[in-house]
Amino acid sequence: MANEFRVCDDCKAPNLKTLLPRLKKLDPDAVIKIGCQSYCGPGRKKTFAFVNNRPVAALTEDELIDKIAERLKSR
């Protein structure tokens, strides 16, 4: 089963221009869905993505990518 990344295009923390290519690099076969994730509170303060329906958040995009990579390895 392919991994799924879900990111918000409404929240201020995630920068989709830089985040999306990095997610594709982590898993080129993953499904990426863009839209409101109803995660507004944390999404204003931290960059985040949902990985296979689980939220992953970090203060920086680099930390987020590291956390997502770990999540994918443990799967």
Curated annotation (Swiss-Prot):
Name this polypeptide is given: UPF0741 protein GTNG_3358
One Pfam family linked to the record: DUF1450
Family the entry assigns: Belongs to the UPF0741 family.
Residue ranges of the TM segments: none
Species whose genome carries this gene: Geobacillus thermodenitrificans (strain NG80-2)
